[in-house]
Amino acid sequence: MDVTLLKVTAILYLLASASFVVYVFLVRDSVANLSPVLLFAGFAVHTAALGVHFLQTGYPGIAQFREALSFYAWLLVAGYLLIQLKYRLAILGAIIGPLAFLMTLAAFAFGTGGGELPPGLKTYWLPVHVTLAFLGNAIFALAFGVSLMYLFQENYLKRKKMTSVMKRFPSLEALDKLNYVLLVWGFPLMTLGILTGSVWAGIHWGNYWSWDPRQISSGIAWLFYAAILHGRITAGLRGKKAALLTMVGFAVVIGYFLLGDSIFPSRHGGRFE
């Protein structure tokens, strides 16, 4: 992946993060429009970096862990920009901007050089499965950010402690509704990611389910999010409890994504023998 473009991306994400923090915590309306613009500029350069990688290697930049980190950050920013376009939720950028910057920076820690794609990954199932799975996870990350905002505001209101920062927050009802909308979008994508992964496993390994650690963790996360949605639809689950459960679900997803393969050996992560 192009090092220069990634460096520019990281710098723009950092500047956007700083701008969001100034807007939210220092209450500077003058940077209200600058923050999303900087993040969009970073997204545009990031898109170019992914495009250059594809032209140079012939495959999308999602096969190796460092590439996955970069792709995840790209999807996260794309999702936020769509939310900003529809809901004008600039304050969410104070969470998503730094997260995207840290993920892009972490990609550098694992190197930027390319490598030969393992034979088992030279298939159209790679972009289909990974894109669906990562889209679902990116939306869950956005739901995590919205849930964090909900808990932050709920805590302030409970203590009857109003500050200028609270003016940046939408109502608790609006945050709860957005959390639900994100779960409704993320869950089907996660489901399709798991299903396409199972089909791919059946084609490559001869069985659709082999109790691989990655499959088990995905199954657990799927059941957890299914339970949250079921509770929201049938049992009136909402508010603080829904926010807490959403955050726990994402902690499971991101925890295994970052640490799972190093703790539990798996045939994922490029090891497609």
Please place each PLM-identified region on the residue numbering.
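Polytopic transmembrane helical bundles with strong interfacial aromatic enrichment
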Residues: 1-273
